[in-house]
Amino acid sequence: MPLQWFLKYRPKSLQEVENQDEVKEELKKWIESWLNGEPTAKAVLLYGPPGVGKTTLAEALARDYKLELLEMNASDSRNLRDIKDVAERASISGSLFGIKGKIILLDEIDGIYSRADAGAIPAILELIEKTKYPVILTANDPWDPSLRSLRNAVKMIELKRLGKYPLKRLLKRICEKEKIVCIDEALDHIIEQSEGDARYCINMLQGIAEGYGKVTLDNVKELVRRKDRELDPFETLRDVFWAKYYWQAKNAVTNSQVDYELLMRWFDENIPLQYTSMEDVWRAYEALSRASVFLTRAKQVGWDLLSYVFDLMGPGIAFASLEKKKPGYKARWVKYQFPQYIQALARTKEKRDSIETLLKKIGEKTHTSKRKVLNDTLPFLASYYTRHAEAVENYLQLTEGEKEILNVFTQASKPTSEEKAEKSKKYYPKRSSSRKT
C-alpha cells in the first residue's frame, strides 16, 4: 500500500516548515521557557484552517528539541479517560512519569461537543492546571462559546493560510523527488482550488500523478474541484467511519462538497481498509449499494430522495460494523486511499479522446453530428474499413488511437457464428426429407 505523500513529505524539523516564521519563533521561545524552568504559559493553542501545519509544527518542535510527543485526539470522547489519566500523571515528577522530556498534544479540541463529550473540557483544564509538561492544543475554529474557558487558560497562536509561492515550492519539490512531469499552470490550478491547504494540494497531486503519470492542466481541471473550507474526502471518510452518533455520520456526508458519485467511489475504495470483519464489509457495501440506487432515483424522480442517500452513505456505512457495539471499541487508524477510478480514468482518457476525434473527423466529412455518426455512419464505415483500410486511413488521416477504435467497431460489426448460422437457416432452409408419393 503506497504511503500518502502528505505523510511522506511532512516536514521533519521547524526549519522545513514553510511560511510560518512568526509562529515558529513564538513556539521556540515558549518551549525554551519550559526547558529553562520558567514557562511563559502552560499550554499553547495553535489555531487556523485545515492543512496549514498545526500538527506538523507540534511534531517538528518535539523532534527539534528531542522531546517525546504524547498525542491524543481531543474530539474523540473515547480518549476522555486517557485525558484524565494523563492529567493525573502529568502532575507527577518526570522520573515517575517516564521519559523526562515530553510534549502533550491534544488535537482538534474544536471537535468537542459540549453535550456528547461532557467532561472533556474540564479534563483538559485540569490537565493544563496540573501539568509539569508543555501542552499543545490545536483547533480549526477555537471561537465556539463552549471553548471560552480553554481560550482563557492558554496562549493563542494563529496560523495563516499558506500562500501560493510556498505551496508551489512544496509541490514542485515533491514532483522532483517523485520524478513526475508537472506543468506550472497545473500546479497553479491545484493551489487556487485548495484554499491554502497544503495537505489537500499534496493529496490531489498524488492522485493525479498516480493516475496519469504526469500532472497537466487538462488532467487537473478534470479532477480537481474547489476545496470546501471545512471538509475534504479524507476528513469525510474519517468522520463517517469514526462517528459515534447517527447525526455525526450524516452531517459528515451532508456537509461534504465532494460530488455524491465521487464520494461513493471513495467509500467503495476504503470500506475494506477500515473494516476487518467480512460481515461488516458486506453490510457497509449493502448500504452503499442502496445509496447508489436512491441517488439514481433522485436524479430521475426528485431530489427529495437525497436524504435517503445521506442516511445510507453516512450512518448506514458508519454503523455497518457490529464491532462498534462492543465495550471499549476504537476505530482503526487507516491511511485512506484514492479511488482506483482515477487510475481507470487515466487508462481510458486516451481512448475517450480518440473516439471524440474520430467522430469529429467523420462528422466534418459527412456534415452530420457526432451522435448521428456514432449511431448511423460508424457501423457502415467499420464494415467498409475491413476491405479498404488504407483508403479510409488516408482519407481521414487517422491516428494510431483512432485506428484502434475503428478496429474495435470493425470487430463488433462482424457477425458471430450463431448469427451466421441463423442467417444460413433463413436464406437456405433445410430441405424436407419426405418425398411425395
Curated annotation (Swiss-Prot):
Ranges of biased composition (kind: Basic residues): 426-437
Keywords assigned by UniProt, alphabetized: ATP-binding, DNA replication, Nucleotide-binding
HAMAP family in the cross-refs: RfcL
InterPro entries in the record: AAA+_ATPase (IPR003593), ATPase_AAA_core (IPR003959), P-loop_NTPase (IPR027417), Rep_factor-C_lsu (IPR023935), RFC_lid (IPR047854)
Family designation: Belongs to the activator 1 small subunits family. RfcL subfamily.
Region: Disordered, residue numbers: 410-437
Subunit note: Heteromultimer composed of small subunits (RfcS) and large subunits (RfcL).
Extent of Basic and acidic residues compositional bias: 416-425
Record SUPFAM superfamilies: P-loop containing nucleoside triphosphate hydrolases
Protein name according to UniProt: Replication factor C large subunit
Function text: Part of the RFC clamp loader complex which loads the PCNA sliding clamp onto DNA.
Organism: Sulfolobus acidocaldarius (strain ATCC 33909 / DSM 639 / JCM 8929 / NBRC 15157 / NCIMB 11770)
Pfam families referenced in this protein's UniProt entry, alphabetically: AAA
Protein residues bound to ATP: G48, P49, P50, G51, V52, G53, K54, T55
Entry annotated with the keyword Transmembrane: no
Keyword Nuclease listed: no
GO molecular function: ATP binding; ATP hydrolysis activity; DNA clamp loader activity
GO annotation (BP), single: DNA replication
